């Protein structure tokens, strides 16, 4: 009788993906309020995050996002470059309002600015790099969800998701899991159905990689043109090493210039026009 095959539960599969993306890798520093999410510490002094708490807080954050009736009133921010693409992809599938890049001061507090918005929920990628948005949210009593590392301050953060918020793979996976959980709760995606969106689409990509591709394509195009040219026989070039016999023994430049007009006989005709 064949042995029964073991199948991972959805939570176990999510934790396996977190381990692959190094979501559990923290920093050498740890905040006092983040100490309860730390599982252990390596010999190098790097703190490891308990992924059970990460998965639990991720589900709590997804429930908070679903409670907002209008998805556009959920603002997702990321001043860190590694999280810009993940924020845009998350907002595309969830329907939230993304702000990738620099946060304009006064977005939540100054009504005169053109970028003024009044959201009901804020999702931040890093409490340190997104400190301006978190500070403004405290002025307007706006609840905040944030991806927090072991050294992240929890000031103005209501729901902290403990994870590695500095790696591009970790940030992409966390937003992918959060978007999938939101779709589960909205009943737009069944839990027994796999999501056809790959995690790779949430990864940040270096713009320099796209700048090098056109040069490579131009070189290959030139090589193809050279290879497609027909083999035309080349005509032999004249031998310039041969010397005219009439000038072989002549060393006088006057003899060499025989038959040519004398340069000294040139008359300036400009005086005639004057």
From Swiss-Prot:
Family per similarity comment: Belongs to the universal ribosomal protein uS2 family.
Keyword presence, Ribosomal protein: yes
Gene Ontology MF annotations: structural constituent of ribosome
One Pfam family from the record: Ribosomal_S2
Function summary: Required for the assembly and/or stability of the 40S ribosomal subunit. Required for the processing of the 20S rRNA-precursor to mature 18S rRNA in a late step of the maturation of 40S ribosomal subunits.
Protein name per Swiss-Prot or TrEMBL: Small ribosomal subunit protein uS2
Protein species of origin: Theileria annulata
Compartments where located: Cytoplasm
GO BP annotations, alphabetical order: ribosomal small subunit assembly; translation
Chief place of localization: cytoplasm
GO cellular component terms attached to this protein's record: cytosolic small ribosomal subunit
Keywords annotated in UniProt: Cytoplasm, Ribonucleoprotein, Ribosomal protein
Subunit structure: Component of the small ribosomal subunit. Mature ribosomes consist of a small (40S) and a large (60S) subunit. The 40S subunit contains about 33 different proteins and 1 molecule of RNA (18S). The 60S subunit contains about 49 different proteins and 3 molecules of RNA (25S, 5.8S and 5S). Interacts with ribosomal protein S21.
HAMAP family xref list: Ribosomal_S2_euk
InterPro entries attached to this UniProt entry: Ribosomal_uS2, Ribosomal_uS2_CS, Ribosomal_uS2_euk, Ribosomal_uS2_euk/arc, Ribosomal_uS2_flav_dom_sf
């Amino acid at each position: 009788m064949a042995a029964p095959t073991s199948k991972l539960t959805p939570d176990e599969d999510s934790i396996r993906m977190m381990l692959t993306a190094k979501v559990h890798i923290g920093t050498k520093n740890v905040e006092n309020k983040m100490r309860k999410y730390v599982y252990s510490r390596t010999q190098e002094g790097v703190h490891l995050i308990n992924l059970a708490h990460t998965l639990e807080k991720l589900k709590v954050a997804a429930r908070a996002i679903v409670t907002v009736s209008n998805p556009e009133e959920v603002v997702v921010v990321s001043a860190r470059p590694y999280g810009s693409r993940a924020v845009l992809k998350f907002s595309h599938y969830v329907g939230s309002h993304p702000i990738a890049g620099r946060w304009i001061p006064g977005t939540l507090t100054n009504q005169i600015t053109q970028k003024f918005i009044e959201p009901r929920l804020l999702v931040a990628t890093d409490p340190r790099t997104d400190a301006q948005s978190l500070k403004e949210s405290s002025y307007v009593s706006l609840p905040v969800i944030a991806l927090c590392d072991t050294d992240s301050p929890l000031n103005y953060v209501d729901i902290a998701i403990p994870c590695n918020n500095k790696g591009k793979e970790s940030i992409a996976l966390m937003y992918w899991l959060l978007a999938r959980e939101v779709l589960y709760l909205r009943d737009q995606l069944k839990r027994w159905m796999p999501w056809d969106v790959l995690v790779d689409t949430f990864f940040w990509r270096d713009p320099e990689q796209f700048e090098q591709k056109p040069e490579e394509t131009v070189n290959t195009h030139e090589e193809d043109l050279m290879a497609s040219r027909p083999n035309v026989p080349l005509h032999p070039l004249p031998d310039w090493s041969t010397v005219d016999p009439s000038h072989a023994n002549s060393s006088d430049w006057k003899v060499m210039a025989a038959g040519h007009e004398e340069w000294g006989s040139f008359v300036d005709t400009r005086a005639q026009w004057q």
